[in-house]
């Protein structure tokens, strides 16, 4: 990208709230039901029906606001956003416009290094404008109806929290880092399941460019319904290139809504972009103002989980792990809980080795099997015992990997699985000094050339001798003792 242009990005994210019923009706929000089986008279906008606000949706919005340090509006109102679309039976969407329930707040993001561009990793705080409650629309189905469109209203009325940032991001990398941080937070808080394939978390990106140093924003295009982090990055990068090329060729960027085509990896025009006045917002006369007292906020605050940033700092201080390791361990609530359960069983002295195992062997196996840590077949108690056996010298770290693989495959239910497998396979580490000395004497006698090379100053020869000793014991020798005994015998 030309260095004379600055990219300006703001994101609007729709997080589907994890309530069992819809925001203004008692209909179910369960995903995947047969079309139009979860739409009640309120969702269908039948004559005479009235909306009733779901308290659980409000509490989830409060929880989010508290987590980002936002202001919870003591009084907010719902408005009608008027537009016509076949999957919107009322002819308007109930949303919030002038006074949203969550105002302000910020999220700190970690932007990874871009080695190709020579850019180091850095931290940035993205300020939020607002987060407001609204209902989702239904779904138009085009594929199964030749020449027609089917309408499924199961999704109509599903509660959404629309989270809007200030236009403060300056690259696709920053936008993706923000989206990932936001996704992790709403899942951590338990207010959204974060399932992007099912549409529970989707982003709209407002993208514009302007000459470096210019204060006035360029004309923006909005890219709708990006439901993967990869699509978000690709769509923004394409749109930035498109706008720069258009301007440099003498054209003008048009304010419009665009869609991203993942097959062609390009954005295309959908419709001209509406402004707020096009929707004729006005307060919904069927809904009273939403009044949130201080006592309500305090009750929600009392039930808040420990937030990732606070837990990360605690892990550094309490367990002595690095800030990076603490960040990985608190990437999900399930990962953090598993780590603490392992340490509780294995002892705080084994916290660092527990962290190394979770980020190494455990994560590798999870990725290989395509599962999350809450479905791990090795319990925290089982892993803790394995780590204790490394610490007390019963087995080496190398043998522990073999034991762990067996535990994973057999999905054992007994907490003592590690001891059972070690005993059954005869994997106990040889730590008897006399036995090891006898083995090392044999190794030295059989490898006179390596002994000569080591004494001539070749350090690699020493490693070769260690390898021979480990081979002679089938990997069961205590590596540290082998090292010490070899040094002693070689003088």
Swiss-Prot record:
Q: Which domain of life is it from?
A: Bacteria
Q: Which reaction does it catalyse?
A: L-glutamyl-tRNA(Gln) + L-glutamine + ATP + H2O = L-glutaminyl-tRNA(Gln) + L-glutamate + ADP + phosphate + H(+); L-aspartyl-tRNA(Asn) + L-glutamine + ATP + H2O = L-asparaginyl-tRNA(Asn) + L-glutamate + ADP + phosphate + 2 H(+)
Q: Which organism is it from?
A: Burkholderia multivorans (strain ATCC 17616 / 249)
Instruction: Print the keywords alphabetically.
Output: ATP-binding, Ligase, Nucleotide-binding, Protein biosynthesis
- What family is it from? Belongs to the GatB/GatE family. GatB subfamily.
GO BP term, example: translation
Q: Which PROSITE patterns does the entry mention?
A: GATB
> GO molecular-function annotation terms?
asparaginyl-tRNA synthase (glutamine-hydrolyzing) activity; ATP binding; glutaminyl-tRNA synthase (glutamine-hydrolyzing) activity
InterPro entries this protein is in?
Answer: Asn/Gln-tRNA_amidoTrfase_suB/E, Asn/Gln-tRNA_Trfase_suB/E_cat, Asn/Gln_amidotransferase, Asn/Gln_tRNA_amidoTrase-B-like, GatB, GatB_C_1, GatB_Yqey_C_2, Gln-tRNA_amidoTrfase_suB_CS
**Any idea of its EC number?**
6.3.5.-
The entry describes its oligomerization and partners as: Heterotrimer of A, B and C subunits.
This protein's name: Aspartyl/glutamyl-tRNA(Asn/Gln) amidotransferase subunit B
Enzyme class label: ligase
Question: Coiled-coil intervals in this record?
Answer: none
Give the function comment from the record: Allows the formation of correctly charged Asn-tRNA(Asn) or Gln-tRNA(Gln) through the transamidation of misacylated Asp-tRNA(Asn) or Glu-tRNA(Gln) in organisms which lack either or both of asparaginyl-tRNA or glutaminyl-tRNA synthetases. The reaction takes place in the presence of glutamine and ATP through an activated phospho-Asp-tRNA(Asn) or phospho-Glu-tRNA(Gln).
């Amino acid at each position: 990208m030309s260095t004379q242009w600055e990219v300006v990005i703001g994101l609007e994210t729709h997080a589907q709230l994890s309530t069992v019923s819809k925001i203004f009706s008692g209909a179910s929000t369960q995903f995947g039901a047969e079309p139009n089986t979860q739409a009640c008279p309120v969702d269908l906008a039948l004559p005479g029906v009235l909306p009733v606000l779901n308290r659980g949706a409000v509490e989830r919005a409060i929880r989010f606001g508290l987590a980002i340090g936002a202001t919870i509006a003591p009084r907010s109102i719902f408005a009608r956003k008027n537009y016509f679309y076949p999957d919107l039976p009322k002819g308007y969407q109930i949303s919030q416009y002038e006074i949203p329930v969550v105002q302000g707040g910020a999220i700190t993001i970690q932007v990874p290094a871009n080695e190709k561009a020579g850019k180091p990793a850095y931290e940035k705080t993205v300020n939020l404008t607002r987060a407001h409650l609204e209902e989702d629309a239904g779904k138009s189905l085009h594929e199964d109806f030749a020449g027609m469109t089917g309408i499924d209203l199961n999704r109509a009325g599903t509660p959404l929290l629309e989270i809007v940032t200030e236009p403060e991001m300056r690259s696709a990398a920053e936008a993706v880092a923000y989206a990932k941080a936001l996704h992790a937070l709403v899942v951590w808080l338990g207010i959204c399941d974060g399932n992007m394939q099912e549409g529970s978390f989707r982003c709209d990106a407002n993208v514009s460019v302007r000459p470096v140093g210019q204060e006035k924003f360029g004309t923006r295009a909005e890219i709708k319904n990006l439901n993967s982090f990869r699509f978000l990055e690709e769509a923004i990068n394409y749109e930035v290139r498109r706008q720069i090329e258009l301007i440099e060729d003498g054209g003008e960027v048009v304010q419009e809504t665009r869609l991203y085509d993942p097959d062609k990896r390009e954005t295309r025009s959908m419709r001209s972009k509406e402004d707020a006045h096009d929707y004729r917002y006005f307060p919904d006369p069927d809904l009273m103002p939403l009044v949130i007292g201080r006592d309500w906020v305090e009750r929600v605050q009392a039930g808040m989980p420990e937030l990732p940033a606070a837990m990360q700092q605690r892990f550094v201080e309490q367990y002595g792990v690095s800030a990076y390791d603490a960040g990985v361990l608190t990437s999900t609530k399930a990962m953090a809980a598993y780590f603490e359960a392992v340490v509780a069983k294995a002892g705080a002295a084994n916290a660092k080795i527990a962290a190394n195992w979770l980020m190494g062997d455990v994560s590798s196996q999870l990725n290989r099997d395509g599962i999350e840590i809450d479905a791990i077949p090795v319990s925290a108690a089982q892993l803790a015992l394995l780590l204790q056996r490394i610490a007390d010298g019963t087995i080496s770290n190398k043998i522990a990997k073999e034991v762990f693989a067996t535990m994973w495959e057999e999905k054992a239910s007994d907490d003592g699985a590690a001891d059972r497998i070690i005993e059954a396979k005869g994997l106990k580490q040889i730590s008897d000094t006399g036995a090891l000395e006898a083995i090392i004497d044999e190794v030295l006698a059989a490898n006179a050339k390596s002994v000569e090379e080591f004494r001539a100053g070749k350090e690699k020869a020493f490693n070769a001798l260690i390898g021979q000793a480990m081979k002679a014991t089938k990997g069961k020798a205590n590596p540290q003792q082998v090292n010490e005994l070899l040094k002693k015998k070689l003088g």
